[in-house]
Amino acid sequence: MACAAARSPADQDRFICIYPAYLNNKKTIAEGRRIPISKAVENPTATEIQDVCSAVGLNVFLEKNKMYSREWNRDVQYRGRVRVQLKQEDGSLCLVQFPSRKSVMLYAAEMIPKLKTRTQKTGGADQSLQQGEGSKKGKGKKKK
C-alpha cells in the first residue's frame, strides 16, 4: 500500500486504462461494457478513443499490442488500450470536466460518432448499397 502512495499520479503507470470494449454497444456488461448501451458506440477502436481524448486536451498514449482480457477475438482490429492521465503531479485534476474515468468514457463515446472517419464511412456505405441494388439479376436454372 505504501508503494502505491509513493508513486506520483503523473506516472504513466498511474494513468487510467480505457479499452475499446468498455465503449462497445455490441458487448454486454459481462463481456466488458462499462457505460449504458444507449450511450455506447458500435465497435470503437483504440485509435479513435486516443484521437477524441487528445483533441480535448488530455495527456494520452496508445498501447497497440495490449488486449482486453475478456476479448475472445484476437484480431488486430480489437487490439489496443489507451492510457489517459486524470490527475497531475500534485493530485489535482488535469481537466475539471473529467473528474472520473467514467466521465472520460462517456465523453469518448459521445464524440467518436462525430469523427470524420466515422461520418465518411457511413456515407460511402450508403452509396455502395444503392449501386448494388440496381444490378440484381436472376441466377438461372437450378442444377439437378
Swiss-Prot record:
Biased composition (Polar residues): 120-133
A GO MF label: 7S RNA binding
Segments for region (Disordered): 117-144
Any one Gene Ontology cellular component term annotated for this protein: signal recognition particle, endoplasmic reticulum targeting
Protein localization: Cytoplasm; Nucleus, Nucleolus; Nucleus, Nucleoplasm
GO biological process, one term: SRP-dependent cotranslational protein targeting to membrane, signal sequence recognition
Protein name: Signal recognition particle 19 kDa protein
